[in-house]
Amino acid sequence: MYDWDEITGNSSNSIGYVNFVDEKHEFVSTHYIVNGIPVVKVSLSKSADDTLEWLYEYLYKLYKEPLYSSESEVQAQYGKLFTDIDKSETPQYIWRTDRSCIALIHWYDSDEDITKYYIKAEPIK
């Protein structure tokens, strides 16, 4: 979706992508810079009951098994691999490619009781 060198600032809008394979699940992405590091978030345009499972299967089809999947491993590695850390985020899985670290995130706002799942990616440090 992105080449890291192309992200030089914060996006002012989200970008939507039609999923021709599964029209029920359309993507939305946004990008921004944190301490000079580009960050991309990809989510489904409409949350569904199967969002976590669907995003996992999507990433699995692209990258196979996650590098980190046990809760303790994921938590420990997330802080080492990612620059943009939000206290409301709980990483579920982490994949690593030649150029990127990719996490499947559970985000929860306890004040509003809102849960979201999304993919977050950053270039390898």
Go through the PLM ranges and name each one.
Residues 1-125:
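A cross-family detector of function-defining hotspots
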